């Protein structure tokens, strides 16, 4: 061990002896005068002393002055030779390297000494109040005096040497660090680094903002496109409903339009707030137009689009869907006549014999005369002449010469057929009106006479001298 190290250890042992005396003797005596238990009171005294030295400046100065006097007495150095500033320098120089001792001012040395002493007192007081040391300090003090003080001195010297090593390392690290020339340069360097970090954050936020603006523009375009499509669809829906409204029982068009959002509807009539009376007038007008459209659609969809009949006879060409007023001789009669002709053919009668038989009847001549005067009936006869079934029957009769027309059986069969026809003519058949014509043409009370025609006035029936008119339907 060199001389410098022995000097340092001597100073550390002197420092430890002073504070061990305070903890072991002075604080113990103060604990005896209190009413609480000695152990508890001693712990309070130790904690109070540590806090007082750290927090109370006057108590610290008083403690330091007492230690200065103790140090002078132990070292046998005259106080005039070792003043207080030299005392502080001597204690601090034992903890720091020599090359830094002269560069440190007295004020910094005093602050270093204060930190060292406060840290040392705190650790020593904690060690003394442990369960290992506290019983030896309170009980059997005389027997345990040397043992307790020896352990306290060893702990004190170990802690001070450890603290000296820490301060040495700090000064060496500080020597390797190049300090800035002035505080202004240090502040500038710190702010420059912070400014660079802020600029980097600004760039990131700017790029993110541009990306969000681009997304917003895309969404706005999509929104405008869908709004335009929505308005177009609403307008088409309005037009479609206006065309397809067909009856009074349908949902009123104005009520449906009022449920649509007005800001997306281009019809100005419904965007404006109109009075209730005006809305009723508009709705009534729309319903009237709907009825007119309905009637036109039904007329256009009717079979062959029949006009209202203007002649004295019923329409000669009925539709397949609606029945018409029938005369005493209808299509059913015509079918029956065809069946009778087939029956005559089977019985050996030809159509020629039937015609000769009918020439003896003046009533049938009148019927033919009436048919010749009626142009519409001529069309019906023309249709009958074109019937292929009758032509086939005539051809069949001509091919059968074996049938004798002068047989008495033939004449009896003709009489039976005539009686059947008269019985069928006397039967009253119901006259059915066409419901389709009733919707568009409602004449006054018209009646049908025995000829199967309806009478419009009294003069109409007087024009006919007699005879029945037979209507044949193909």
UniProtKB/Swiss-Prot annotation:
It is a single-pass membrane protein. Induction: Expressed in the late phase of the viral replicative cycle. The keyword Protease does not apply. GO terms for cellular component: host cell membrane; membrane. Signal peptide: none annotated. It is found in: Host membrane. It comes from the Viruses. Residues 183-233 form a coiled coil. The keyword Coiled coil applies. Residues 294-305 have a biased composition (Polar residues). The chain crosses the membrane at residues 7-28. Glycans are attached at residues 73, 83, 195, 209, 449, 459. Keywords: Coiled coil, Glycoprotein, Host membrane, Late protein, Membrane, Transmembrane, Transmembrane helix. Residues 294-324 are annotated as: Disordered. Belongs to the asfivirus B475L family. This is Uncharacterized protein B475L. It comes from African swine fever virus (isolate Warthog/Namibia/Wart80/1980) (ASFV).
């Amino acid at each position: 061990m060199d001389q410098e190290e022995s000097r340092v250890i001597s100073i550390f042992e002197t420092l430890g002896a002073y504070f061990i005396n305070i903890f072991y003797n002075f604080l113990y005596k103060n604990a005896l005068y209190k009413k609480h238990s000695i152990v508890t009171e001693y712990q309070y005294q130790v904690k109070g002393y540590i806090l007082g030295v750290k927090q109370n400046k006057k108590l610290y100065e008083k403690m330091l002055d007492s230690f200065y006097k103790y140090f002078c007495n132990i070292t046998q150095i005259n106080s005039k030779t070792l003043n207080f500033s030299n005392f502080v320098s001597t204690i601090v120089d034992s903890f720091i390297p020599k090359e830094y001792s002269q560069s440190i001012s007295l004020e910094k040395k005093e602050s270093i000494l204060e930190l060292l002493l406060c840290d040392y007192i705190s650790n020593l007081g904690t060690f003394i109040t442990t369960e290992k040391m506290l019983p030896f300090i309170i009980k059997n003090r005389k027997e345990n005096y040397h043992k307790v003080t020896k352990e306290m001195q060893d702990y004190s010297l170990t802690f001070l040497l450890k603290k000296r090593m820490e301060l040495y390392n700090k000064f060496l690290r500080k020597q390797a660090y190049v300090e800035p020339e002035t505080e202004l340069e240090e502040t500038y360097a710190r702010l420059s680094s912070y400014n660079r970090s802020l600029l980097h954050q600004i760039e990131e936020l700017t790029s993110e903002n541009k990306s969000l603006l681009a997304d917003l523009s895309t969404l706005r375009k999509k929104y405008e496109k869908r709004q335009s499509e929505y308005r177009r669809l609403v307008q088409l829906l309005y037009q479609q409903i206006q065309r397809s409204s067909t009856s009074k029982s349908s949902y009123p068009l104005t009520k449906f339009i009022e449920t649509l959002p007005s800001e997306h509807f281009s019809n100005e009539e419904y965007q404006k707030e109109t009075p209730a009376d005006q809305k009723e007038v508009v709705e009534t007008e729309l319903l009237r137009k709907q009825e007119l459209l309905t009637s036109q659609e039904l007329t256009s969809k009717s079979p062959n689009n029949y006009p209202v009949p203007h002649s004295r006879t019923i329409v000669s060409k009925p539709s397949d869907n609606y029945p018409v007023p029938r005369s005493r001789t209808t299509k059913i009669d015509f079918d029956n006549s065809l069946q009778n002709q087939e029956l005559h053919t089977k019985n050996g009668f030809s159509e020629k014999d039937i015609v000769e038989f009918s020439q003896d009847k003046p009533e049938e001549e009148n019927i033919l005369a009436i048919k010749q005067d009626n142009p519409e009936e001529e069309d019906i006869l023309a249709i009958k002449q074109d019937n292929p079934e009758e032509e086939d029957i005539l051809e069949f009769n001509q091919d059968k010469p074996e049938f004798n027309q002068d047989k008495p059986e033939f004449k009896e069969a003709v009489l039976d057929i005539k009686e059947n026809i008269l019985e069928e003519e006397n039967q009253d058949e119901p006259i059915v009106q066409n419901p389709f014509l009733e919707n568009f043409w409602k004449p006054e009370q018209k009646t049908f006479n025995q000829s199967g025609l309806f009478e419009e006035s009294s003069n109409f029936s007087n024009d006919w001298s007699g005879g029945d008119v037979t209507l044949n339907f193909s």
